[in-house]
């Protein structure tokens, strides 16, 4: 779904690189994704097939301007949260519960199906939008929130 969506965008003309982080999950499926990407897209493709040191991975994520996740279920939440905090424009499938969870907390996230015009522009977030998402991140992920969650979990309060 994502590769077909990307095929219609002007990735090559704008010198974009598609990053495929495939270091976990089914290796045979990852092979199919890589093969399909090379036959479908006409731009640079970078694959991550092995785990790398966390600092190196975070450096790669910090360079991502647009992140597209095509899964229908809640997966890759840690990557999505980090990308939002690092300033990436994130697109999720509209049936992905994480899209709704993030929007409920006022994050600026986009639906892959409903916001296709936004995706087609191939622009990242503005500085104001990045600051907004970082503020949402700080409100959502902090020690006070973690303590409250643990108290509810452990003490059913």
Regions found by a protein language model. Name each.
Residues 48-60, 96:
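Conserved active-site histidine-acidic residue motif and adjacent donor-binding/catalytic loop
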Residues 89-92:
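Short hydrophobic beta-strand element within catalytic cores of glycosyltransferases
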Residues 58, 78-86, 99:
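Short alpha-helical segment that forms part of, or immediately flanks, the ligand-binding pocket
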Residues 1-10:
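A conserved mid-protein helix/loop that constitutes part of the nucleotide-sugar donor-binding site
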Residues 59-75:
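Acidic donor-binding loop of glycosyltransferase active sites
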Residues 119-157:
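A charged, aromatic-enriched C-terminal amphipathic alpha-helix characteristic of glycosyltransferases
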